[in-house]
Amino acid sequence: MFICSLGAKIKVCGRHNVPKGGPFVVVINHFSYIDPPFVIHAVQRPISFLAASDQVITPLYLWAPFLYGFITTDRTRLAPSTIKKSIHALKSGDILGIFPEGTSLSRVLRPAKNGAAFLSAAGNTPMLPVGIVGLE
């Protein structure tokens, strides 16, 4: 699925690929702090995102808990507590959103980390790849 922002207009391509029910892992490229609302708009279901623990306390994230859930994670390693919370969310039927590049505010696509694939396999859930263009 692709999400394209053309000014204020949002175009979603491939929405038919979004699973109709059940849990899954949404794997998204990450260019901006405003990526999560675009993904929620495209998927049209609540999503809990993995968020870097050092970013959760910044003013840019103060609005996040009101719009969607998040599970904090360490940028450098996938901690056991993050794994447990993420798998619990998937087993409870939630959708888990992961930005596998591990950071935002980049103008180029960065190499992905393997946590999304690990959590998808551990939770026995499908992955939905999502590409965002137009925000870089």
Predicted stretch roles:
Residues 4-136:
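Soluble catalytic domains of membrane acyltransferases
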